[in-house]
């Protein structure tokens, strides 16, 4: 288990990087976040959580939610039903690319770009009567925090700026790879992205990725094989176009969001969440990546 002093050291180490990135500004609710925030939390497979910095302050998890939605889909569908509609390959294009959807005839490259996450949301909408409520139940149980909620302001703001995601959904629908009502699925998708959680919540919630699919209370959420496969996808596609750089520097499966959060895992040991709202050119937390790099170096841990 990393010691408290190490996490404090990690936060202090990256503080000089503040001011070098840019906060996401495509919706006001994200643009107004204090850019100077820094937080880190670690949860070990024995269930202990420690943190440093602003690790208890909630933030918009954005694309980190795509890990939860894919996990939920894996509990509801046969794997062939999922992977016949979305691929497992890195994208190489922007996370909201229309060009790639067109070129690949409506099948997204992976579940962590917007097109892929929209297909997963479409699957959940088709199978669940109340997909937003089911997601909230899941993340509250995983994080052991009943106060986790959706930020309605963020969800509404995302919906008001939804033209590109709607275009992606309709393009996939034209190829027969989107079954539900586009507007309904978009509203569900934006609620997922608008989940508010803190670093401690997320490090606890993602522990199943480090613990062979078992949650904090020992329940098997997904199988050991599915967990290994999900971690492989996170290692290759979890950081937008920065996945290779992240693997090189950090050496952990991870998933980022434009709210400035990144989750990562060391299988068999721990899950970690960092948060710093300023992003690099790939849309990943600049100081957050540096925190994870420093942590992995100090722990001497990497999956490679």
Curated annotation (Swiss-Prot):
EC number: 3.5.1.2
PANTHER family: GLUTAMINASE
InterPro entries with a match to the protein in the record: Beta-lactam/transpept-like, Glutaminase
Gene that this sequence comes from: glsA
Catalytic activity field: L-glutamine + H2O = L-glutamate + NH4(+)
Protein name, UniProt field: Glutaminase
GO biological process, one term: glutamate biosynthetic process
Tagged with keyword Hydrolase: yes
Keywords: Hydrolase
Organism for this UniProt entry: Shewanella sp. (strain ANA-3)
Pfam (any one): Glutaminase
Binding site residues for substrate: 63, 114, 158, 165, 189, 240, 258
GO MF annotations in UniProt: glutaminase activity
Protein family per UniProt: Belongs to the glutaminase family.
Signal peptide from the UniProt entry: none
Quaternary organization: Homotetramer.
């Amino acid at each position: 288990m990393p010691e408290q002093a190490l996490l404090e050291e990690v936060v202090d180490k990256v503080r000089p990087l503040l001011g070098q990135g840019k906060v996401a500004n495509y919706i006001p609710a994200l643009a107004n976040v204090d850019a100077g925030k820094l937080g880190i939390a670690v949860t070990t497979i024995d269930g202990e959580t420690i943190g440093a910095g602003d690790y208890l302050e909630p933030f918009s998890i954005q694309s980190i939610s795509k890990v939860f939605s894919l996990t939920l889909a894996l509990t509801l569908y046969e794997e062939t039903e999922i992977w016949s509609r979305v691929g497992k390959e890195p994208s190489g294009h922007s996370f909201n690319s229309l060009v790639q959807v067109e070129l690949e005839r409506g099948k997204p490259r992976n579940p962590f770009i917007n097109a892929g996450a929209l297909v997963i949301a479409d699957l959940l909408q088709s199978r669940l009567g109340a997909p937003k409520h089911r997601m909230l139940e899941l993340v509250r149980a995983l994080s052991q925090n009943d106060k986790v909620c959706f930020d309605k302001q963020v969800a509404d703001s995302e919906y008001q700026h939804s033209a590109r995601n709607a275009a992606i959904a309709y393009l996939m629908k034209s190829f027969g790879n989107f079954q539900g009502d586009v507007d309904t699925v978009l509203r569900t998708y934006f609620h997922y992205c608008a989940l508010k959680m803190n670093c401690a919540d997320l490090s606890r919630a993602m522990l199943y990725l480090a613990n062979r699919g078992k949650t904090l209370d020992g329940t098997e959420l997904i199988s050991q094989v599915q967990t290994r496969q999900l971690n492989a996808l996170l290692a290759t596609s979890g950081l937008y176009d920065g996945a290779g750089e992240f693997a090189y520097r950090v050496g952990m499966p991870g998933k980022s969001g434009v709210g400035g959060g990144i989750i990562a895992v060391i299988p068999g040991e721990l899950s970690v969440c960092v948060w710093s709202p300023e992003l690099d050119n790939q849309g990943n937390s600049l100081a957050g990546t540096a925190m994870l790099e420093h942590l992995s170096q100090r722990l001497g841990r990497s999956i490679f």
